[in-house]
């Protein structure tokens, strides 16, 4: 659904990981923080988060802009739209709201779409960047009130 970058471990952390693997040490003190029923309940609660028509139209317009962008080989698919919709609902839920705001959508455009879009050869040669293009496209779409 999303592509996030968490970076690399520090030199020390990476060496410790390698040494623990060589020594056959496994993490044994892992305990669950949530059970299956709770996951299913949260999933249903996220699906119940309201997306007003104008916010849905805002999402669709952003998706459509990717299809018109010459720097992309092909624009975002309808499934990308659905992923943006679900991710926005989850963000709203985690923020303690039962409705999606345009800011939720804006915050997730990069994480949801960046791995779904491929730059053209010309764009790559011109040192274009998917995230910068997405930011530019989002600024071209009127934010609903």
Regions found by a protein language model. Name each.
Residues 66-145:
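C-terminal engagement/docking regions of AAA+ P-loop ATPases
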Residues 1-49, 53-61:
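Conserved AAA+ ATPase core "coupling" helix
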């Amino acid at each position: 659904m999303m592509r996030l970058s968490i970076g690399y471990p520090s030199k020390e952390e990476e060496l410790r990981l390698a040494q623990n693997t060589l020594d056959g040490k496994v993490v044994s003190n892992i305990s669950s923080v949530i059970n299956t029923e709770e996951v299913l309940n949260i999933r249903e609660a996220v699906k119940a988060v309201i997306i007003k028509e104008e916010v849905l139209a805002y999402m669709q317009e952003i998706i459509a802009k990717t299809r018109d962008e010459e720097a992309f080989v092909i624009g975002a698919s309808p499934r990308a739209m659905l992923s943006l919709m679900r991710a926005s609902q989850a963000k709203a839920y985690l923020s303690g709201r039962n409705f999606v705001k345009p800011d939720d959508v804006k915050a997730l455009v990069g994480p949801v779409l960046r791995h779904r879009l491929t730059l053209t050869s010309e764009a790559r040669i011109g040192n274009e960047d998917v995230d910068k293009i997405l930011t530019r496209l989002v600024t071209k779409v009127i934010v609903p009130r």
